[in-house]
Amino acid sequence: MRTTSTENQSTEEHFKVPSSKFEFKRWSGVQGCSRLEILSIVHHCASGDNPTAMEYRLLGGSGLKVSALSFGAATFGGGNEFFKAWGETDVAEASRLIDLCIDSGVNLFDTADGYSDGRSEEILGKALGKKRERVLISTKAYFPTGDGPNDRGTSRHHLRVALEASLQRLGTDHVDIYHMHGFDALTPIDEVQDSLNKFVREGKVNYIAASNFSGWHLMKSLAVADRYGWTRFVAHQVYYSLVGREYEWELMPLGIDQKVGALVWSPLGWGRLTGKIRRGQPLPEVSRLHKTADMGPQMADEYLYNVVDALDAIAGETGKTIPQVALNWLLQRPTVSSIILGARNEEQLKQNLGAIGWNLTAEQVAKLDKASEVTPVYPYWHQRNFPERNPLPV
């Protein structure tokens, strides 16, 4: 496990763990922030309750500040039937969405070489153009990019080829955050981490991150990097939503302990928390779930309806929409550095950007927690029987 140096101790005051909640103290020496209220790894700078004010949070244990709401380019391109269901955004529409994001304070744009066979990266690069230097770009490698035996995974060979191809498509000389889009059990971890460390030393990557790792995958990767003094993962891109809370069982405590920030993908539960799905009503014809439901997380209808009912009630109390309430709940969760928004049009994007600049009350958060709780699997149900010595993060 990573130890804390004396220098770090002088900068960051202690935090204590009461019965089942983490209580975090203010960081000394932090300028421009009224409070530190999410986690020790989240730098929360908000300007009151101004709905147009973006928050900027530290990305894990790094010094990089990312907007609390970021933009995901998986809707760009529509390269195959799966991605067409997500969106078919072209360069012109992408430019409008990006301008809206930048005007709203968004500084992080996420893509992957596997999105629409690289077309997403191409469109993002063209749409950003000269604005690229004003923002951060995150991309990923792991999924197949060709038919060859080495056109996939995270081997040294594939990562080198994949990174160079991504840089070319994006029209940039470096990637700000480079994710391993999945864990490659066939490649030694030291080979992966050594390759990523070299990319950072070469200036082609600034920060590295994981995505969709199990707890032991992430911890072993961090341990290998620490052993050799290599650059370590500062973030983990994860699926997390009101109807998908498994992240809280193992990965969230790991993120707290190791200062690994969460970049949340599909924060609206694979399209289920858009407000269009209601109890007793058929699935809307325009829903992408008709084509993608079998590839995403599964859940019982009654569970989903209970969560939507709770969201609907709180939306009525706050004057917000169901997606805005669902996103605001996530913004208050431990370890969350940024929520990646996906949108096919400006109306969707504007609505989602309205999740910032206000907060649900503790009572409203508790109501959503209750409606969305699920029975944990082993060993987590056993651990929760005695939280005194192993407190829960939420």
Predicted regions and their residues:
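Conserved, mostly hydrophobic/aromatic
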Residues: 59, 71, 94, 109, ...
